[in-house]
């Protein structure tokens, strides 16, 4: 009986022989070492000779050992996958470092910065830049044509009128200027809006200049404004305030304009000045 049981047990194939037809990968599907030793070592066979095996107990114990082998098998597979992932990450990191080392220039040819850079200089305001430009307006090396009567430059940027200062507010949506303050303060903006919606001609400028004396429906505009002034009395303050604004504009222009302001140039001659040269002596006057 013992010899028959031993022959039947030897006919049972081990698990590695059952899976030999499948292409195995040493890095992923490596068989567990404890299970291989348990199936291939002769000590297990010797112990089976010593123990009394029966035909009823052998089929129940064998699947139990096979299930233990299957339970132990995923652990090395998981470890092998984690080791592969770690090796791939190390190789990727090393390649990235080599790439950065090849791109980054060597510090041997560059100076080493040892001090913390200070805060950047804030850009100057437009008014300060304009003031510097106007202060340098009297320098003869920066202007080409000088008037002989007043000694000032006659180029177009210098002789242009200087408007009153203005700025943009609300993320550059609202223009804050003397003109806009005058329109909103005297309710002229309401008149402009009314004329804009009542006008049928797209080329009509009555909405832009409602107080002009132009031939474009002048009588109708002034009559409508006279009627609206009964409900908006602040419209009566528009003309006096407009005159005050014009005087302020003239005063600001006389103070800030660096160019020539001569009205007539009948006996004046403009001359060209080279940079770095001394002031020329007074030239002879000749008629133009």
From Swiss-Prot:
GO terms for biological process: animal organ development; negative regulation of ERK1 and ERK2 cascade; negative regulation of fibroblast growth factor receptor signaling pathway; negative regulation of MAPK cascade; negative regulation of neuron projection arborization; negative regulation of Ras protein signal transduction; nervous system development. InterPro entries: Sprouty, Sprouty_domain. GO terms for cellular component: cytosol; membrane. Keywords: Cytoplasm, Neurogenesis. Its main location: cytoplasm. The keyword Cytoplasm applies. It holds the Pfam family Sprouty. It is found in: Cytoplasm. Widely expressed; particularly in the fetal tissues. Expressed in the brain with expression the highest in Purkinje cells in the cerebellum (at protein level). Expressed in the myocardium of the heart. Residues 154-260 form the SPR domain. Induction: By FGF signaling. Repressed by microRNA-143-3P, which results in activation of MAPK signaling and promotion of excess accumulation of extracellular matrix. May thereby play a role in myocardial fibrosis. Inhibits neurite branching, arbor length and neurite complexity. Inhibits EGF-mediated p42/44 ERK signaling. Negatively regulates the MAPK cascade, resulting in a reduction of extracellular matrix protein accumulation. May function as an antagonist of fibroblast growth factor (FGF) pathways and may negatively modulate respiratory organogenesis. Belongs to the sprouty family. Interacts with TESK1. Interacts with USP11. Interacts with CAV1 (via C-terminus). The gene coding for this protein is located in the pseudoautosomal region 2 (PAR2) of X and Y chromosomes. This is Protein sprouty homolog 3.
């Amino acid at each position: 009986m013992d010899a028959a049981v031993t022959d039947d047990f030897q006919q049972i194939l081990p698990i590695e022989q059952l899976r030999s037809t499948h292409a195995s990968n040493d890095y992923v599907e490596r068989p567990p070492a404890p299970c291989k030793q348990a199936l291939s070592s002769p000590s297990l066979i010797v112990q089976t000779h010593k123990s009394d095996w029966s035909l009823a107990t052998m089929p129940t114990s064998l699947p139990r050992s096979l299930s233990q082998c299957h339970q132990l098998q995923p652990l090395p597979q998981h470890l092998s996958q984690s080791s592969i992932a770690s090796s791939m990450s190390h190789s990727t990191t090393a390649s990235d470092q080599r790439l950065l080392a090849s791109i980054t220039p060597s510090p041997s040819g560059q100076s080493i910065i040892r001090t913390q850079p200070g805060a950047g200089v804030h850009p100057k305001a437009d008014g300060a830049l304009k003031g510097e430009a106007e202060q340098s307006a009297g320098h003869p090396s920066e202007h080409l044509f000088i008037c002989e009567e007043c000694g000032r430059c006659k180029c177009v940027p210098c002789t242009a009128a200087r408007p009153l200062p203005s700025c943009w507010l609300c993320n550059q949506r609202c223009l804050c200027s003397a003109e806009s303050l005058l329109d909103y303060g005297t309710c002229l903006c309401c008149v402009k809006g009314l004329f804009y919606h009542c006008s049928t001609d797209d080329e009509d400028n009555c909405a832009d200049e409602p107080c002009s004396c132009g031939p474009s429906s002048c009588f109708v505009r002034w009559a409508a404004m006279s009627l609206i002034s009964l409900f908006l009395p602040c419209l009566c303050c528009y003309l006096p305030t407009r005159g005050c604004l014009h005087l302020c504009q003239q005063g600001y222009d006389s103070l800030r304009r660096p160019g020539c302001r001569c009205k007539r140039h009948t006996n004046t001659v403009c001359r060209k000045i080279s940079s770095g040269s001394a002031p020329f002596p007074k030239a002879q006057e000749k008629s133009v």
